[in-house]
């Protein structure tokens, strides 16, 4: 009886993941929600370099650590800049990569997040490096992972950045993190996207709070 129940549970888990097509590379488009800002009440901000400093590992023990389907030491920075997660089988084993669409990168997505955050705070986005307010960004984490469960799957996403802002000659550095978890029944694009969208939304809330506390 117990063996029958276990076999059924394993079969259901396999079917759930199979319905998500976890084999091979998955392409996952991501968007940043936009809301009406306050207008340019605080002037213009120039956003300079957005750098990817995520650390990838070969066969990490935790799914929350970035990895690829292959040898990370042989991957170029350009290839890694597109990877945002790994798929898993019903036992938690790593499968194919999850990547942004061709020609998109974590730097592009993060820049859009930072721009949206500044707009909501009342800044216009400028192109002059000599602007009174300027910012640079270092991406520490931009990753999603999945944890299989008996009756549902947990999709988690984490976006963490170091933000350096210089305003009127004064420089401050902050860490901003957005995190979210989404429970779903199948490893499909919408479930991955819901996790990322919620993490983006949380990031923007934390961004607003961080700048407010800094008087920016």
Roles of regions detected by a PLM:
Residues 1-9:
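Bacterial N-terminal signal peptides that target proteins for export
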Residues 80-101, 168-215:
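Short secondary-structure boundary motifs at beta->alpha junctions and helix caps
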Residues 25-30, 116, 120-171:
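Surface-exposed short loop/turn segments
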Residues 21-108, 212-216:
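A structural "domain/chain start" motif
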């Amino acid at each position: 009886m117990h063996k029958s129940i276990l076999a059924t549970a394993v079969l259901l888990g396999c079917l759930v993941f199979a319905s998500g097509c976890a084999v091979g590379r998955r392409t996952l488009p991501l968007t940043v929600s936009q809301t009406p800002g306050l207008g340019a009440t605080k002037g213009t901000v120039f956003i300079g370099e957005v750098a990817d400093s995520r650390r990838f590992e070969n066969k990490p023990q935790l799914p929350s650590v970035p990895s690829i389907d292959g040898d990370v030491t042989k991957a170029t920075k350009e290839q890694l800049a597109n990877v945002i997660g790994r798929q898993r089988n019903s036992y938690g084993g790593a499968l194919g990569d999850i990547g942004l669409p061709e020609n998109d990168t974590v730097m592009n997505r993060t820049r859009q997040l930072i721009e949206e955050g500044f707009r909501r705070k009342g800044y216009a986005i400028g192109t002059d490096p000599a602007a009174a307010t300027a910012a640079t960004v270092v991406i520490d984490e931009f990753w999603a992972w999945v944890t299989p469960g008996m009756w549902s799957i947990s999709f988690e996403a984490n976006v963490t950045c170091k933000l350096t802002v210089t305003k009127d000659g004064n420089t401050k550095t902050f860490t901003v993190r957005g995190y979210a978890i989404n429970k779903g029944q199948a490893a499909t694009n919408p479930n991955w996207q819901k996790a990322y969208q919620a993490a983006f939304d949380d990031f923007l809330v934390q961004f607003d709070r961080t700048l407010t506390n800094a008087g920016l």
